[in-house]
Amino acid sequence: MEELLTALRAVGEPTRLRLLNVLSQGEFNVSELTQILGQSQPRVSRHLKLMAEVGLLDRHKEGSWVLFRRREGGATGALGGAIVGLLEQENAVLERDRTRLREVLETRRQAAMAYFRANAADWDRIRSL
């Protein structure tokens, strides 16, 4: 019971609710999350750290990036999913977050396309590294 109470206290703040909502849409790094939320890196990092510590978020390293996502399993994962389900998605702030999220995903897509265009000829060699 204490684990759930701690998690509930952790999401009792507007920025953390927004992060939980965004991170239910996929994995994002801190830089992307600052763009989506329109907040500073130290502030976003502090919220992410707290939410990961109480078990609402999973984090993993991919190269030099640390990616975050909403935890799916366990009691805190179920709690996070239930809270996201209760959010009023027509809220203007959440709609703005979704617009920025789409922009971040489009930027990712364009960067991947540019990388593969630039490296297509050497792709087999790159994959073998």
Task: Say what each PLM segment does.
Residues 2-43, 49, 64-74:
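N-terminal helix-turn-helix DNA-binding core of bacterial DNA-binding proteins
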Residues 2-3, 74-129:
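Amphipathic alpha-helical dimerization/coiled-coil segments
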